[in-house]
Amino acid sequence: MLRVLGIESSCDETAAAVVEGAEHGHPHGVVVRSNVVWSQLEVHALYGGVVPELASRAHIRHIQPVIEQALAEAGVRPQQLDAIAVTVAPGLVGALLVGVAAAQGLAVALDKPLVPVHHMEGHLMSPFLMAGVVPAMEFPFVALLVSGGHTLLLHARDFGDYQLLGQTRDDAVGEAFDKGARMLGLGYPGGPEVAALAQSGDRQAVAFPRVLLDRSQFDFSFSGLKTALRTHLLKFPPESGGPSLADVAASYQEAIVDTLVIKSLSACRHVGVSRLVIAGGVGANRRLREKLAKQALKQGVQLYAPPIHLCTDNGAMIASAGVCRLARGDQARGVVNAVPRLPIHELEKIYGR
């Protein structure tokens, strides 16, 4: 049994977790012993988005207490760890460096292996951490990874074997929600704000575009949708008799959801798999999960939608990927650097390959 501490600090959550997994290194059977997350939401809400410098400072203040709490909740002494895993890419460079420095210090002090982990590979581990799911998660599958900084579709053929099917050409879906929320006069983060307002709105009130649906590839684009929202609000302001803000929010959210659902299920058909995973912060959107589940069922696709605490950034997913990487011998051979930009299909560069 491998016992791994995972550390995550790529953006605005300071997280650490302890997991245990089998030495064969398959994500099945990984048990989460603790999973501690300190959110910086209140730090950044005043600014309407993540401020990198403030994020780094908050990580510095909270990284050690979060690690100590994760160890305490797991009932594990540092010497009982087999390795320390840490997110090294991609993310805000200052934020990444805080986690990397903490992990390297621990690894040296304890004389334990340090395992670098790609953030998006961590998200791919989240469905394997769902207890009691029938049928159990297996490779291969298609993954829709959606967050403030990423929107992409992957064909995960096996652990470490990922084919990029499509990605956003401009804004990530989380950015589309944040910027849309700002236009609607809502707060940050935009996704939950838009979703809350949309609950009382008519999803068909405004005919917003679904972009790139008529093409065979799986890229996304949300810049045109944002422009359509801005144009609509200028032409038909709610205070002058236009559709209500709730109707506009519901229609805007539905356009985003439709695009993600149609592309994801089309990708499943394209590669011939019947398992679909959704992960990342936007994966917590209730309407997206609801519509994806309904359409997946119609098309004979099994949807794996992890609980919200596993969709958003957390240490358990990093520790789980760390177990698998450690079993493959993928550990640091020297000083580890933070890499702010690294596509998941190039993640082997982390391990010198």
Swiss-Prot record:
Gene3D superfamilies per UniProt: 3.30.420.40
Family, as annotated: Belongs to the KAE1 / TsaD family.
Annotated catalysed reactions: L-threonylcarbamoyladenylate + adenosine(37) in tRNA = N(6)-L-threonylcarbamoyladenosine(37) in tRNA + AMP + H(+)
Organism superkingdom: Bacteria
UniProt function note: Required for the formation of a threonylcarbamoyl group on adenosine at position 37 (t(6)A37) in tRNAs that read codons beginning with adenine. Is involved in the transfer of the threonylcarbamoyl moiety of threonylcarbamoyl-AMP (TC-AMP) to the N6 group of A37, together with TsaE and TsaB. TsaD likely plays a direct catalytic role in this reaction.
Residues at which substrate binds: 145-149, 178, 191, 285
Native organism taxonomy: Bacteria, Pseudomonadati, Pseudomonadota, Alphaproteobacteria, Magnetococcales
Name of the protein: tRNA N6-adenosine threonylcarbamoyltransferase
Species of provenance: Magnetococcus marinus (strain ATCC BAA-1437 / JCM 17883 / MC-1)
Molecular function GO labels: iron ion binding; N(6)-L-threonylcarbamoyladenine synthase activity
